[in-house]
Amino acid sequence: MIERIWSGSSLVYLLLLPLSWLYGLVSGLIRLSYRCGLRKSWRAPVPVVVVGNLTAGGNGKTPMVIWLVEQLQQRGYRVGVVSRGYGGKAEAYPLLLNAGTTTQQAGDEPVLIYQRTAAPVAISPKRSEAVQALLKQQPLDVVITDDGLQHYALQRDFELVVIDGVRRFGNGWWLPAGPMRERASRLNSVDALIANGGVAQPGEIAMRLQARDAVNVASGERRPAVELPHVVAMAGIGHPPRFFATLEKLGVAVEKEVAFADHQEYQHGPLAALVSSEQTLLMTEKDAVKCRAFAQPNWWYLPVDAVLPPDQAEQLLHNIEALLTK
């Protein structure tokens, strides 16, 4: 229902416009208060790169964060990541992730980033505290903040925004009548704009998600997803149809699709009931980090990598590296 409202195909959004106007007013005043110095912001002693969204709901931000971390690591930079840790509840903040940190503590996206990149990751509702915790632990050349475009309490040196290249900005309204967190004109002040899927517009960098072989959640075995038998596909991400479309493009014969809410918490019983012993449960990697402790032998996940055009990727990295060598 929310997708129909935000896309403009349902007139229900008209009923939500008063709330959207209020949201837009408040968010605009918050940003203005920081720009005018009425609220204080904190500047880190190292460059901060924000990877964020202008809209709510599954734009492909996490794969982009992972790509950026890995690219900078390959160039010899010491990279740290901070996040709010949405979906998790730590006993105390800031929380520095380690091999034993659970998604219940830190949220699924920080755990996924930590496991994929081995970069130091810290979470806190106050991102400045997370940055300070990272720097206290070890020296870093750059900090990447996962989301946080609207978190103006932390000053940033480079803003990178990921948009859904297919859905774009929906009906163009602020939350909750539409998907917008800020006006589209906010893009005029960012340093890079990544279009995930669809057709990139002038000034945007095209990005696509490339699937790897499927991985068994329990054993780590790898196999082409198309070889998995009797697949039941599940996704608890911001935009589940993207995952299902990826499987279709790969030629995976999906018998059933199951969509969950983003950051959904899972338990063994309900997930096990989705498939018989002859079927395969195929999920996203973001879902898998929440299921490893109780995974069954017929549970698999599909890792994806962000892929950018080489020339545009090189220019993007060049612009970021220029900050690190000042």
Swiss-Prot record:
Keyword Nucleotide-binding: yes
The keyword Nucleotide-binding appears for this protein: yes
Amino-acid positions noted as binding ATP in the UniProt annotation, renumbered to this chain: 55-62
Pathway(s) of this molecule: Glycolipid biosynthesis; lipid IV(A) biosynthesis; lipid IV(A) from (3R)-3-hydroxytetradecanoyl-[acyl-carrier-protein] and UDP-N-acetyl-alpha-D-glucosamine: step 6/6
One BP term from GO: lipid A biosynthetic process
GO molecular function: ATP binding; tetraacyldisaccharide 4'-kinase activity
EC number: 2.7.1.130
Reaction(s) catalysed (UniProt annotation): a lipid A disaccharide + ATP = a lipid IVA + ADP + H(+)
InterPro entries in alphabetical order: LpxK, P-loop_NTPase
Coiled coil: none
Keywords: ATP-binding, Kinase, Lipid A biosynthesis, Lipid biosynthesis, Lipid metabolism, Nucleotide-binding, Transferase
GO cellular component: plasma membrane
NCBIfam families associated with the record: lpxK
HAMAP family membership: LpxK
Function: Transfers the gamma-phosphate of ATP to the 4'-position of a tetraacyldisaccharide 1-phosphate intermediate (termed DS-1-P) to form tetraacyldisaccharide 1,4'-bis-phosphate (lipid IVA).
Family: Belongs to the LpxK family.
Protein name: Tetraacyldisaccharide 4'-kinase
Organism: Serratia proteamaculans (strain 568)
